[in-house]
């Protein structure tokens, strides 16, 4: 935060983005200031709930919703959890793109169904897609206007339904609809080609270096490999599904995991195959209304 002082008097408090040549000239030349006052907001309490509420001793907040579009300068870009006794009964996102909010909510909803959400399982059909999915690190009026902030709190005994209710609320109050749908989708399936165990770890320190060169997994589960392959499209744009049924920890080494053909060839030494097929997969589908 920046404090503006002139002639020994406090003029304003702002964020650093407002420190520009034109803003400084306005102050020096005693012109009408375009500065927007920024006062730090406490994210640990319900977002923008008046402190007057704290003086009411005979009432207890049961639920709370705050939802806004456009950058809030007094808040950072991030997220916050409202928790009690290990249960999350509220979630806060500040200055995020809708895609970032959707993916975080989707991750929780997929986990509740025993699945793992990846970028390859998110289908953005919005036109143009940049309305909800853009680089939030670029700060300008256009991107600031597309940022959203939400604080969504449910009664503590309804914590299990937090994310489904949160998504429903966002669907009702934006021009878009997000749903979890099973769709038959092209994918790559990891399979074992024999009953011989060529995967079992010899022990030692757990190493997750799958995306490095050379690629190394030591004393780790296959889930590390699947997660890394699904994290981006560097190896393939297709989702990777594990159908090996192998639950133990493994030792694996590859020369170049960014080249699909090389990876498939080197998987064979462990009696593994990565084959293209189709499967009904749970997808996070985002549509215009």
Question: Where are the regions a protein language model picked out?
Answer:
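Beta-strand-rich assembly/attachment modules of structural machines
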Residues: 30-289
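Non-catalytic, surface beta->alpha helical segment in thiol-disulfide oxidoreductase systems
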Residues: 10-31
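A short, hydrophobic beta-strand/beta-hairpin element that forms part of a small beta-sheet core
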Residues: 1-13
